[in-house]
Amino acid sequence: MFQIYIWGAGFYAKQVLGEIDDSKAEVLGIIDSDRKKQGTKLFDTIPVLCPSDISGRRFDYLIISVRNYGPVEEACIESGIPSEKIIVYWKESPDNSVFKKRAERVEGLIWEKQVCQYRLDSAPYEWSLKPSPKIWEGAELLKKIAQDHSSLCRFGDGEFEMIRGKVRPWFQKPDITLGERLKEVLCSDDVRINIAIPQNFCGFDKYKEDAADNIRRYMFGNTRTDILALLDKDRLYYDAYVSRPYMMYKDGKNADEIFPLFQKLWKDRDVLIIEGEYSRIGIGNDLMAKARSVSRILCPFKNAWDKYENILNTVLEKANREALICISLGPCATVLAYDLAKRGYQALDIGQIDNEYDWYMQGAKVREDIPGKLVAERPAGQNLELDEEIDYQKQIIARIRGN
């Protein structure tokens, strides 16, 4: 049984007492330099002592509970208490044996500290103290596409990380050639092609707090600098979050506007969907209900870039020139939409719009499994069996299998 003293009879002492494992440790007393507290029974049977009371006594640990622990820790060491016997409640320690819940609490404190760093790092851009890329909102992008029948290439964190040679999406391994092709697309000045990047720089007030903090965390360090170096400060971009209009926003107004604008794009048109196996866009919902017809080319749900030439050639062979080609295939979709647009097709990289639509229709509060469909954020343990496959199977006109 460890013998323990706690320094500080203030507000946090009870919190510390509540986390000590009484099957492993016994609290001998609470130490406080406030004479008004000394000798009282603030903590039932545990006495409040003055610092000199423990002089010469044997104990295993002294736990410092006060938030301003620096001066106390220094004074304890100067008084002769070995540093290995001092545990600061507010710091990580190699010895968690006397606590029941300390690991979870410390993890929470570390995250709070990191969030503060992320917010401070992002603040100059959010407050327009530093210049950010010019990014038009998603609704304006979709209205433009409806008017001029242009194409869409989207860049999210997966595409930027691919350019940077880093691992991001679990469904596509890093590839130098893919990274170079993505750079080519990003620099394209073809008026038929809209380049979309995520609004990760400012205007965070419309996002949920956890979504905003996740963006700040991703952009922290060298990420923002690297991405800015890839962008043209004089160019007009569009918001890549157009394909994620629901879950990350504080209210449903954005989704209320965006989904009908998407559906207007394919109303009364022949739609060819290029998707990863198990994406099943429009199945189980009415997202594509207004299309004149829907056909599909299924591709590998993982590492589709390995089969890119096969995918491109199959699309060129099967696609109707007047069809609207909708692509959901990770970073591969960005390049494919570009290559098809260059050949005169209208191609849209629609990303995870179908998952977002399912959650929107369900009123979901968090990203959750969607039976019969692969959700990129939840790669493990999903139910991918489809209850009614007849119409879906009829729509499949080609299938490219992975390695």
Spans of features found by a protein language model:
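Electropositive, gly/pro-rich neighborhoods at or near active sites that engage anionic ligands
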Residues: K100-A289, R401-G402
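Short, surface-exposed basic-aromatic patches at helix termini and helix-loop junctions that form
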Residues: D21-D22, E78-G80, L287-A291, E317, ...
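Short, charged, surface-exposed secondary-structure boundary motifs
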Residues: K37-F43, P94-K101, N303-N310, D349, ...
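Active-site regions of enzymes building and remodeling cell-envelope glycoconjugates
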Residues: L42-P51, E78-K85, W170, E209-T225, ...
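C-terminal functional extensions of proteins
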Residues: V335-N403
